[in-house]
């Protein structure tokens, strides 16, 4: 499997409104400059750069491009100020009940440990080099299917963490980068404002090391989990891309014969 084929597969097996986004960190200036994608000439929040990439835009970013202080902190392009680190900053805005809880949020977030010289944010299908992180923002049904694809090879996902804050920058990017594992987010009010996500959209971050097996897992779990209506769409999208659709089996699901109904006899 390669990147282009994996995108063809995932966009066939899932009915995505947005294309998967690849994130690559550069820690060498020469490598960053040689990466043939134009650097954005304006400020942008990191989360909105992901949103733009999900609609086909490709860009490189440096610390000068960062339009959100919290996103820049997660990416280690800005130092974490003391009021944020000690919990007083968020407590002052009544985000958390007390200083202990507020500080625990800062303590438990996983930011980059080394500052990158730059970041590439673009549609996954555009990459020739391997990105570090893949982000999919979609409806809960599609994120469920990605989780099921992950579970096919990995079992239970035990370390999902989110708190409705720093959703794209920390939940989906730096937390995933540090743990080398998937994570989900329900997004946060900030990114929903500046990136204008739809109300029903949530996200999942995937380390590239797990990407191909997740795509394969989504494919393998299609017949047990997808209903006939969804299978019709999958079959159509596969054929439109010239991909093999012969493995799609209708009238077959994991829960066949499991449910019962009808009138019951009551006592008395």
Model-derived regions: residue spans:
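Acidic, serine/proline-rich low-complexity intrinsically disordered regions
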Residues: 3-268
């Amino acid at each position: 499997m390669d990147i282009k084929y994996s995108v063809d597969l995932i966009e066939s097996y899932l009915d995505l409104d947005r294309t998967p986004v690849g994130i690559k960190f550069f820690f060498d200036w020469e490598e960053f400059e040689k990466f043939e994608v134009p650097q954005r000439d304006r400020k942008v929040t990191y989360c909105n750069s992901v949103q733009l990439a999900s609609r086909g835009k490709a860009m490189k970013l440096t610390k000068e491009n960062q339009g959100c202080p919290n996103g820049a902190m997660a990416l280690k392009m800005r130092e974490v100020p003391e009021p944020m680190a000690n919990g007083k900053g968020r407590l002052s805005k009544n985000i958390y009940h007390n200083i202990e809880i507020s500080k625990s949020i800062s303590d438990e977030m996983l930011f980059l440990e080394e500052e990158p010289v730059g970041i590439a944010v673009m549609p996954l299908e555009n990459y020739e080099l391997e990105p570090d992180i893949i982000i999919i923002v979609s409806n809960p049904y599609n994120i469920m299917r990605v989780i099921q694809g992950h579970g096919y090879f990995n079992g239970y996902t035990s370390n999902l963490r989110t708190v409705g804050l720093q959703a794209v920058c920390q939940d989906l990017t730096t937390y995933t980068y540090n743990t080398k594992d998937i994570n989900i987010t329900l997004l946060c009010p900030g990114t929903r404002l500046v990136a204008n996500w739809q109300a029903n959209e949530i996200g999942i971050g995937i380390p590239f090391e797990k990407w191909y097996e997740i795509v394969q897992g989504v494919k393998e779990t299609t017949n047990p989990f997808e209903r006939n209506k969804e299978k019709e769409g999958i079959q159509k999208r596969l054929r439109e891309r010239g991909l093999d659709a012969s493995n799609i089996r209708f009238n077959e699901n994991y829960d066949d014969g499991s449910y019962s109904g009808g009138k019951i006899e009551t006592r008395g």
